Curated annotation (Swiss-Prot):
Gene: dbp8
Motif (DEAD box) on chain: 239-242
Role played: ATP-binding RNA helicase involved in 40S ribosomal subunit biogenesis and is required for the normal formation of 18S rRNAs through pre-rRNA processing at A0, A1 and A2 sites. Required for vegetative growth.
Subcellular location(s) of the protein: Nucleus, Nucleolus
Domain Helicase ATP-binding per the UniProt entry, residue ranges: 117-296
Description of its domains: The Q motif is unique to and characteristic of the DEAD box family of RNA helicases and controls ATP binding and hydrolysis.
Species of the source: Aspergillus terreus (strain NIH 2624 / FGSC A1156)
EC top class, as a word: hydrolase
Pfam families: DEAD, Helicase_C
Name of the featured protein: ATP-dependent RNA helicase dbp8
Positions of the UniProt region annotated as Disordered: 1-70
Biased composition regions of type Basic and acidic residues, renumbered to the chain: 1-16
Family: Belongs to the DEAD box helicase family. DDX49/DBP8 subfamily.
Amino acid sequence: MENDHSSSDEHEHENPELQTRAPKRRRLSETSEDDEYVAAPTPLPTLSRIKKKEPKDENKDTSTGTDNPVLIKDALEMGLQDAGESSFKALNVAPWLIGSLTTMAVRKPTAIQRACIPEILKGRDCIGGSRTGSGKTIAFAVPILQKWAEDPFGIFAVVLTPTRELALQIYEQFKAISAPQSMKPVLITGGTDMRPQALALSQRPHVVIATPGRLADHIQTSGEDTVRGLKRVRMVVLDEADRLLAPGPGSMLPDVETCLSALPPSSERQTLLFTATVTPEVRALKSMPRASTKPPVFVTEIEAGGTTSAGADGAAPKSTLPPTLKQTYLKVPMTHREAFLHVLLSTDGNAGKPAIIFCNHTKTADLLERLLRRLAHRVTSLHSLLPQSERSSNLARFRASAARILVATDVASRGLDIPSVALVVNYDVPRNPDDYVHRVGRTARAGRRGEAVTLVGQRDVQLVLAIEERVGRQMEEWSEEGVSVEGRVVRTGVLKEVGSAKREALIEIEEGRDVLGRKRNKLKKVR
């Protein structure tokens, strides 16, 4: 490259024809000296050559790495690695995919991507566990697209995920990564008309991203012609596998089994499971009987420090939270929880932060949105009782910062990647510690800083202790310099203001009006 640069300079000085042509391009200038000085402007490629030339000339000075002062600890926390496979090229990713990822500003693979992509490309089944925000979607999307490009046909892959919003996010990522190719993904989720979805399935898209309930409906009711293409699927992904495979009330297992029954047997397809919490149900799949022709399952669990535990059969690692997350709690009386929340969101430190408030029940989320709206907060909501069109528009408003606060149930706790979120508030303490891990994972993503505040009542102490045992870290008591939440609630008119707003919100709900005061029919849950 250095020789090319020097030779181009010599050619420019030695070629008289080039020197005589250059002034003709700059007839706007009237002085010959100016023309001579700017006759050969430096093109962009020359700038890049100069940058590449510097390390060769100053090799001894730059060997210490002072140009990129990244500490080893910080690099591990970000899922980066200076030595070994620190690029997608080293993982044998196709050049067109590397270019597509670069366009998306994804230049270095994270720990879960480094561990899984080469093994998936080898054809191995995979169980991947890694903390939230670590790039699990790219870890399975890239090898799927690379293998599809080698033999594109019909429905190549099916991705199952528990929520509509996460399915939409995965669908958009597949479209973005596959932009240079003519890959056709299709989104199959509840809350929308089944007829266009059935038509799309019958036209043999390349990748199907679906929620289990809606895809099971199509398998059972849309006819053989619609789902015949599923019989040739090569790859299956269970994203948020712990939720998809969880037993008990509200389990998705029956729908997942219906979906898998329409696909080729496990011996004839590649199965990928990804989750932030590797549960016993997920880990047990490693020991299931396998065809002798298939390679062993690849199991990896990436801890928060970037270390890899491959093939582990013990308990799930506790360090599943990002190191940049600050965990705090705020003691609140059960009768004044709304007032404490209002003051917490209004402090100088929190007033400008995009925040997600998690509730255990849809009715609580609905009430909180109405109450906070009356208290002058820019707020929207996301829960299962809303029509799908409203869920999508509310989430879009929050992504675009038209609303600062999103009040949500656990439908928003998994997979949603909204980098601007700086604060997560657990209005209700989750009953399952794994749900806490997913909730607080909505902030402090990809190395950014974030805070999670849990409102703790008298009856929540045991739940908090279980959470601390699960994550291996203790929560600190919330504090902000010069702020006493309890003092502001007691000594100001907050209690009266919040009480009045709550009464108005309850009346609005009883009258069957939406958050804008418009009369509407009772909401029905759509599968």
